[in-house]
Amino acid sequence: MSKSKIGEDVYKKVDKVNAELFVLTYGSIVAQLCKDMNYEKVNEELDKMGYNIGIRLIEDFLAKTEWPRCADFRETGETVAKVGFKVFLNFSPIISSVSDDGNTFVLTLDDNPLAEFVELPADARQKLWYSNILCGVIRGALEMLQMDVDAVFLRDILRGDEHTEIRVHLKRILKEEIPPGDE
């Protein structure tokens, strides 16, 4: 069964939150952060929030999908795009620009549900990555799978780009360490 089909099947089975409520709530959080701090700090805060979500979301993902360990980082990218995004956000970005060494890929989002109903103020267009929470979620989830990654936005429709793109780069595979006394 294809990854896209598995993502679709799992999405149909899980409890859902009203998409508009989710998008509007996220927008309210970002708006409040923008009032409280500068855009660079907002980007950091959204990434941190996403990271904390990602380290918990991966457990839910694995429980719902019973997904086996991926053979390589490219397969991980395809799983994130075709299954992970589909299960939790009901869309599947396109994976592209896979590096020759297989340690980097780009996720292209034609539709970003977080960006619905959003128009950035002119002063935010060069500094704010509105959906930066997604980078944090990817980073947190993959870290729980022993992958230390960078996830950064390259382009954003809200900044006037044609597509939204996130580059994910594998820095290193983390070693599983057993806590002292748990041998």
UniProtKB/Swiss-Prot annotation:
<keyword id="KW-0813">Transport</keyword>
<comment type="similarity">
    <text>Belongs to the TRAPP small subunits family. BET3 subfamily.</text>
</comment>
<dbReference type="GO" id="GO:0016236">
    <property type="term" value="P:macroautophagy"/>
</dbReference>
<dbReference type="InterPro" id="IPR016721">
    <property type="entry name" value="Bet3"/>
</dbReference>
<dbReference type="GO" id="GO:1990071">
    <property type="term" value="C:TRAPPII protein complex"/>
</dbReference>
<dbReference type="GO" id="GO:0005783">
    <property type="term" value="C:endoplasmic reticulum"/>
</dbReference>
<dbReference type="GO" id="GO:0030008">
    <property type="term" value="C:TRAPP complex"/>
</dbReference>
<dbReference type="InterPro" id="IPR007194">
    <property type="entry name" value="TRAPP_component"/>
</dbReference>
<keyword id="KW-0256">Endoplasmic reticulum</keyword>
<keyword id="KW-0564">Palmitate</keyword>
<keyword id="KW-0963">Cytoplasm</keyword>
<keyword id="KW-0333">Golgi apparatus</keyword>
<keyword id="KW-0449">Lipoprotein</keyword>
<dbReference type="GO" id="GO:0006891">
    <property type="term" value="P:intra-Golgi vesicle-mediated transport"/>
</dbReference>
<dbReference type="GO" id="GO:1990072">
    <property type="term" value="C:TRAPPIII protein complex"/>
</dbReference>
<dbReference type="GO" id="GO:0033106">
    <property type="term" value="C:cis-Golgi network membrane"/>
</dbReference>
<dbReference type="GO" id="GO:0006886">
    <property type="term" value="P:intracellular protein transport"/>
</dbReference>
<dbReference type="GO" id="GO:0005829">
    <property type="term" value="C:cytosol"/>
</dbReference>
<dbReference type="Pfam" id="PF04051">
    <property type="entry name" value="TRAPP"/>
</dbReference>
<dbReference type="GO" id="GO:0005634">
    <property type="term" value="C:nucleus"/>
</dbReference>
<dbReference type="GO" id="GO:1990070">
    <property type="term" value="C:TRAPPI protein complex"/>
</dbReference>
<dbReference type="InterPro" id="IPR024096">
    <property type="entry name" value="NO_sig/Golgi_transp_ligand-bd"/>
</dbReference>
<feature type="lipid moiety-binding region" description="S-palmitoyl cysteine">
    <location>
        <position position="70"/>
    </location>
</feature>
<keyword id="KW-0931">ER-Golgi transport</keyword>
<protein>
    <recommendedName>
        <fullName>Transport protein particle subunit bet3</fullName>
    </recommendedName>
</protein>
<dbReference type="GO" id="GO:0006888">
    <property type="term" value="P:endoplasmic reticulum to Golgi vesicle-mediated transport"/>
</dbReference>
